[in-house]
């Protein structure tokens, strides 16, 4: 069964406590107050006009080394919310972020594809949480993506520019069942055009 229910538009506030805040205006420093370390895992990311360009093989990741757990980013048994502003450069399918402490792990992940307007979110078990057309030109301007799972047992909801677009039809620990998912990785990690990102925030209950 296609795991989406398209709903009426509505507004949403923040869920839980801010754990990670990466404005990506001039660097990848966490401004949440939790001092979560980040690093350039590969490539040469570019900061310009208040945003981060992740192009070619550029990758930004939490932790000072690969595989370093950030316990406050663990979502096991919790509700969570993530949000960010993004503008696509590539027209093809691109990985925007991965919920992992390892740069080589492919899931959980969020993908965007400018040519079709599709957003895809896959769980740590590679389940299809969302596959939905966001209904706008991803390259025209920055747009806001917000995904909220209020509690572990609730169904995640997808908001675009603060308007509810869709809801998943199942809940659970979609973002992982261990500390292996207690981190984030940003970037395509491949020799291709990418995207611009800013104002990333992550909350847990």
Can you describe what each PLM-predicted range is?
Residues 1-23, 201-205:
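Enriched but not universal
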Residues 121-144:
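Short, aromatic/His-centered strand-loop micro-motif at the edge of beta-sheets
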Residues 140-150, 156-158:
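Short tryptophan-centered beta-strand motifs in secreted/extracellular beta-sheet-rich domains
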Residues 168-196:
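Flexible glycan-contacting loops in extracellular carbohydrate-active proteins
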Residues 20-49, 54:
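Short, tryptophan-glycine- and acidic/Ser/Thr-enriched carbohydrate-recognition patches
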